[in-house]
Amino acid sequence: LINLDNLPIPARHLVNMEGYFDIGAFHSAKSRSNRVLNIMCSRGCPEKCTFCTTPQMWGSNVRWRKIDDIMLEIKNGVKDFDIGEIQFEDDTITARKKNLIELCNGLEKIGLPWCTPNGIKTNYHLANQPDMFRAMHESGCYQVTLACESGVQRVLDHVVNKRLKVDQIKPAIENAKKAGMLVHTFWILGYPGETFEEINK
């Protein structure tokens, strides 16, 4: 699907949302509320990480929904289900700074806490543009999950096939913490061909 604006807002009224809220299906230990709205603003990822199926599922071209539609979905969640937190499940929510800042501006007006549990790319933008993290935090983001995968450049380059430099990881984590957010990270151990020395590193 190329144009995500052709998608209707999910018909959550057809689902027993209270049942999900009651069992805490959508929230983590750090969640601000058990009444969580899971939402996607975009689809697609330009990366070709060997372990991931996102490009096969959603394509490699990143497409965003209109901000007005995203805000309407959130407002409907608040009105219909008394939502207390938003979790964005996008794979590349930080890939386009312009879209992210526009999203943050809208979220700041709504005033709900939000996070990115799905893991966002620990890329050049996050390592060298701390203003992105500041904008996220000011709009309510209390926690980010950074997809690091490995601390060994050979593994990132030749096993994971991830366009990420090891020396970008620490600055990205530090920038998120300085902005005031909790930081979770994703790591994968035991890739084919990975040595014990590399795992220990």
Explain the meaning of each model-derived region.
Residues 132, 193-201:
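Catalytic cores of alpha/beta
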Residues 12-191:
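Radical SAM [4Fe-4S] cluster-binding motif and immediate context
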Residues 1-8:
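Glycine-rich beta-alpha loop elements in corrinoid/cobalamin-binding modules
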